[in-house]
């Protein structure tokens, strides 16, 4: 039995590594930064304001703006999220939005319909209603007397997604966006599926969102209507995972909100940002290659967090860089930002493998365009003597991996807040099919997506293949540089899966995640193939044997560029003053300014019997409290996913209390057919 599991979660620190995917609400405590208190503009804060919509719904907003904005209007920068400005994103909001306001912007945090203090109901992520509401919000902002009429959108993860999606709707007042840790393709590169395989992280994300939507609005802001709003949400709470499991291929559901369907719909300038440790990096090269609008990109070493607070470091002065972008596009100030290379990326040095890195050494490199003309594929061939630069014989080799291969793979979307990154790959490598080079004579650096092409056959109609590119150190330790997943039923694309014919050879192509990494001389480049990668992906119903008859690896080798050394240094990280909180007891924290007490605890468990792929199960439990003085609420959620050969089975429960009185209890027990998974 392989178990990953259980950890307590403390309020304001909501992401144990094993929870897989939680849309980073908090700020890593170990990220050093300069706290700025003296700004060019005095700041006025509007704690709570209603934005009216045409259908009568009101969205709740919190706004920071210069004190004199009514006399000297300023551009607005919108962050539009479902994570509760009051009790969810308060920590990172305090660091970011006053900083923007102090430099001459109206920074606006709006709760999406059905979340936080806003009216209405939320039924799914990235719904058309969410976009329609955003269009009204932007028009409302542009019309305010304190706004110059120019609006930008900035957000990470969900807020990065909807920034791209709303930009594609072309609201006239939206002049530019900054999108962080997002994707242009909701099926190909989001938390739900990877290469047609079901990601375990999608369960963690669905379970987190299931609990997050149970939070009540604050009576101090909305008055006595809080209870009716809360009960209405609880009684209409959707089971998100059931929705997402009902779309196991790239159909119209996933095409909605995927801006890759029409890149040219986006006409405003785009600044795309992510980190190599994050799960959301692959969209950036595609956005650079396919957008027609002005665009820039920045890829650092970071996990899933804003670059001024993210780990692994080094952090940068992201807020200063954001201001340069906004000043250029929202204030028509020539900051020189568009004179710089299209892409700046962190070239990561080789490090000992570990599930947590506080910092990743490296240097900044830059490319004037993407695809970069100076990067060409360097081809290696799979042969009987390993990876070679010339083609040679490969005796067919079979692999049928243990169901426990992948235990050192880390989370699909690391947050850098704990041991959630890939560790030493030697254990997984020992149960995989390996091809590797001799020790390198010279250093090699890659920038972009490695591509692996294989001729394979399976003895079962369904099979997964995990492909890992590793840096093997002289001491034998193995550092994962990149990886890709392919459910072989999806060999011809994500829209039209087809069962394999056992014994028939197929040529498959696996594009690995984009990477920026160095292989030092004396190290070896290793390709590792396995038919399982648990608990990152759900196993096939039968444990297949896949035979490899031949193949190649194309590495995007980047030559040394002397111009890299001439890049101007990025500024050191700065933020506004953090929100003051007081830990009261394990798992409970008080927001001092509001007197609100937030409690969070829970656990997450994954299990598989090494001899039975149908034994896979994931479970998550959350218990959360929100209280102030005599007002007390509590809500608990549980979710469980398991399977048969033909179906995914999903069990869930939610119970909520006001004080000690139960006010709502619901249960779900549903089954979704397995389709080519």
What residues fall within each predicted segment?
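Alpha/beta-hydrolase fold nucleophile elbow
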Residues: 145-157
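Cap/lid segment of the alpha/beta-hydrolase catalytic domain
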Residues: 68-142, 191-192, 461, 470-474
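Short terminal hydrophobic/aromatic SLiMs and anchors at protein ends
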Residues: 1-2, 9
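Short beta-strand/loop motif that positions the catalytic acidic residue
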Residues: 266, 272-274
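N-terminal cap/lid segment of alpha/beta-hydrolase-fold proteins
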Residues: 33-69, 436-442, 455, 496
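Accessory cap/linker subdomain of secreted extracellular hydrolases
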Residues: 93-94, 102, 168-265
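Glycine-rich nucleophile elbow surrounding the catalytic serine of serine-hydrolase chemistry
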Residues: 156-165
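C-terminal, loop-rich substrate-recognition/catalytic regions characterized by aromatic stacking residues
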Residues: 298, 308, 312-657, 661-677
């Amino acid at each position: 039995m392989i178990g990953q599991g259980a950890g307590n979660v403390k309020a304001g620190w909501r992401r144990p590594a094993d929870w897989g995917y939680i849309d980073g609400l908090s700020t890593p405590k170990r990220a050093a930064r300069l706290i700025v208190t003296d700004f060019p503009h005095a700041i006025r804060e509007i704690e709570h304001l209603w934005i009216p919509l045409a259908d009568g719904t009101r969205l709740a907003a919190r706004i920071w703006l210069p004190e004199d904005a009514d006399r000297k209007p300023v551009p607005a920068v919108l962050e539009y999220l479902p994570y509760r400005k009051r009790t969810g994103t308060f920590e990172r909001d305090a660091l970011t939005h006053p900083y923007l306001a102090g430099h001459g912007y109206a920074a606006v945090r709006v709760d999406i319909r059905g979340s936080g203090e806003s009216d209405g109901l939320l039924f799914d992520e990235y719904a058309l209603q969410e976009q329609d509401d955003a269009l009204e919000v932007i028009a409302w902002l542009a019309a305010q007397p304190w706004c110059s009429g120019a609006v930008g959108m900035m957000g990470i993860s969900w807020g990065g997604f909807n920034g791209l999606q709303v930009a594609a709707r072309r609201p006239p007042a939206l002049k530019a966006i900054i999108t962080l840790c997002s994707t242009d393709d909701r099926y190909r590169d989001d938390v739900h599926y990877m290469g047609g395989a079901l990601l375990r992280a999608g369960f963690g994300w669905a379970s987190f969102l299931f609990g997050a939507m149970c939070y009540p609005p604050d009576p101090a802001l909305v008055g006595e209507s809080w209870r009716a709003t809360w009960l209405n949400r609880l009684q209409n709470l959707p089971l998100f995972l059931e929705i997402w499991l009902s779309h196991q291929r790239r159909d119209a559901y996933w095409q909605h909100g995927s801006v890759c369907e029409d890149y040219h719909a986006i006409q405003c300038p785009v600044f795309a940002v992510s980190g190599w440790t994050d799960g959301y990096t692959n969209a950036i090269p595609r956005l650079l290659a396919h957008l027609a609008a002005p665009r820039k990109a920045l890829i650092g070493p970071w996990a899933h967090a804003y670059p001024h607070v993210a780990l692994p470091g080094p952090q940068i002065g992201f807020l200063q860089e954001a201001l340069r972008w906004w000043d250029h596009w929202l204030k028509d100030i020539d900051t020189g930002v568009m004179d710089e290379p299209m892409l700046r990326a962190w070239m990561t040095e080789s490090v000992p493998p570990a599930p947590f890195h506080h910092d990743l050494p490296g240097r900044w490199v830059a490319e004037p365009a993407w695809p970069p003309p100076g990067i060409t594929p360097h081809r290696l061939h799979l042969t009987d003597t390993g990876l070679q630069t010339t083609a040679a014989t490969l005796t067919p080799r079979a692999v049928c991996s243990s169901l426990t291969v992948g235990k050192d793979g880390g989370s699909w979307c690391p947050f850098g807040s704990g041991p959630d990154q890939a560790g030493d790959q030697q254990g997984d490598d020992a149960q995989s099919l390996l091809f590797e080079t001799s020790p390198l004579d010279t250093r090699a650096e890659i920038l972009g997506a490695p591509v692996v092409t294989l001729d394979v056959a399976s003895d079962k109609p369904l099979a997964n293949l995990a492909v890992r590119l590793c840096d093997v150190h002289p001491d034998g330790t193995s550092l994962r540089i990149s990886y890709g997943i392919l459910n072989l039923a999806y060999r011809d694309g994500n829209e039209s899966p087809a069962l394999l014919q056992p014994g028939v050879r197929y040529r498959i192509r696996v594009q690995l995640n984009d990477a920026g990494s160095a292989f030092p001389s004396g190290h070896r480049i290793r390709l590792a193939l396995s038919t399982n990668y648990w608990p990152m992906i759900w196993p096939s119903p039968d444990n297949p044997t896949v035979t490899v008859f031949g193949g190649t690896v194309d590495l995007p080798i980047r030559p040394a560029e002397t111009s890299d050394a001439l890049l101007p240094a990025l500024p050191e990280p700065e933020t506004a003053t953090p929100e003051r909180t007081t830990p009261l007891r394990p798992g409970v924290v008080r927001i001092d300014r509001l007197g609100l007490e937030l409690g969070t605890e829970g656990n997450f468990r994954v299990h598989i019997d090494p001899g039975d792929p149908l034994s896979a199960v994931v479970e998550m439990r959350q218990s959360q409290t929100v209280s102030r003085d005599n007002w007390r609420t509590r809500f608990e959620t549980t979710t469980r996913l398991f399977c048969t050969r033909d179906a995914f089975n999903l069990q869930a429960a939610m119970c909520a209390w006001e004080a000690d009185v139960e006010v709502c209890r619901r249960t779900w027990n549903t089954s979704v057919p397995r389709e080519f998974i």
